[in-house]
Amino acid sequence: MAMTDPLGDMLTRIRNGQQAKKDSVLSPASKLRANVLEVLQREGYIRGYSEDASGKHAALRIELKYFEGEPAIKHVARVSKPGRRIYSGSKELPTVRNGLGITIVSTPKGVLSDNEARTQNVGGEVLAEVF
């Protein structure tokens, strides 16, 4: 059966892994997923990620981050879904928790956080929000 929302699946794996206090989780690899993980790592929400080719298909091993036993990611949600795409200009990008969280945006300049997109004055598809 085909997966309709691969990015949503990865975010759910991260959420479930942190609830289960896992050190790392595996997710099938794709360029979009790797770019989103790059933003999460840059912003300090995960320790890192690496490509894991031990199985039949390429996968991404996501190293989850905890602070004093609590997950670094309190909330992660998909915003733009396959059934309803959400786009935003650079000036209308949503802020998460008054700037305490980030919005991940797919722009013509790549996948960026909301702050980076505002700085570069580009808008795009609002992929997810994290705090």
UniProtKB/Swiss-Prot annotation:
MF-aspect GO terms: rRNA binding; structural constituent of ribosome
Name of one Pfam family that matches: Ribosomal_S8
InterPro entries named in the record: Ribosomal_uS8, Ribosomal_uS8_CS, Ribosomal_uS8_sf
SUPFAM superfamilies: Ribosomal protein S8
Family of the protein in this entry: Belongs to the universal ribosomal protein uS8 family.
Purpose: One of the primary rRNA binding proteins, it binds directly to 16S rRNA central domain where it helps coordinate assembly of the platform of the 30S subunit.
Subunit structure: Part of the 30S ribosomal subunit. Contacts proteins S5 and S12.
Protein's recorded name: Small ribosomal subunit protein uS8
Protein's organism: Erythrobacter litoralis (strain HTCC2594)
Organism placement in taxonomy: Bacteria, Pseudomonadati, Pseudomonadota, Alphaproteobacteria, Sphingomonadales
